[in-house]
Regions:
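Switch II (G3) loop of P-loop NTPases
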Residues: 19-34
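Conserved beta-strand segments of the P-loop GTPase G domain that flank and frequently precede/overlap
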Residues: 24, 48-52, 81-84, 113
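Generic detector of well-ordered alpha-helical packing
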Residues: 8, 27, 53, 85-88
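Short, solvent-exposed loop/turn segments at secondary-structure junctions
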Residues: 31, 57, 88-90
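Short acidic active-site motifs
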Residues: 32, 36, 58, 98, ...
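Conserved P-loop small GTPase signature centered on TRAFAC-class small GTPases
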Residues: 15-19, 73-170
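Switch I (effector-binding) loop of TRAFAC-class P-loop GTPase G-domains
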Residues: 1-19
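Inter-motif core of Ras-like GTPase G domains
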Residues: 34-56, 62, 66-72
Length: 170
């Protein structure tokens, strides 16, 4: 089922005894919500660019979303490319290699998820929150770079999950 409007959710996470509130906006990439989307880019600390691996058109819009992020978001904002619906791999229209390639082009991480089966959803949000918390409290505060030199996070901590974040390192 596709989103048919703007969906807004709050997700509360506790990390190291610190409460973190994530505001999650889902515009389903619809042009009619572009004004809303671009205004929220300005205050965002992280942007998850989500496409449907079973829908080529969805993937083809990634470049447009990245251009909007470059134009409207603050410099160094954490960006992650997310291929959703990995539970429907048999209907895949976008290969993992192709998705990794575009993520590499932008110097960001790539992960595949399934919102339906909640595959790596919690890992994605928790790791994003941990990264942001480290930049606010213990990090440089710039939001730029990590140990591997990219604007990204490493979700490879949980080796038991087969749909992990790909390092995209050359």
């Amino acid at each position: 089922m596709n989103s048919i409007g703007v969906d807004f959710k709050l997700k509360n996470i506790e990390i190291d005894s610190k409460k973190i509130k994530l505001q999650i906006w889902d515009t389903a990439g619809q042009e009619r919500f572009k004004t809303i989307t671009t205004s929220y880019y300005k205050g965002a600390h992280a942007i998850l660019v989500v496409f449907d691996i079973t829908d080529r058109d969805s993937f083809d819009h990634v470049r447009n979303w990245m251009a909007d992020i470059d134009k409207f978001a603050k410099e160094g904002v954490l960006r992650i490319l997310v291929g959703n619906k990995c539970d429907l791999a048999h209907s895949r229209q976008v290969s993992m290699e192709e998705a990794k390639e575009i993520a590499n082009k932008y110097g960001i991480k790539y992960i595949e998820t399934s919102a339906k089966d909640t595959i790596t959803i919690d890992d994605l949000f928790i790791s994003t929150a941990k990264y942001l918390l480290s930049k606010q409290i213990g990090g440089t505060g710039t939001g730029k770079g990590t140990e591997n030199g990219k604007n990204g996070i490493d979700l490879m901590n949980n080796n038991n999950n087969q749909h992990q974040m790909n390092n995209n390192q050359s």
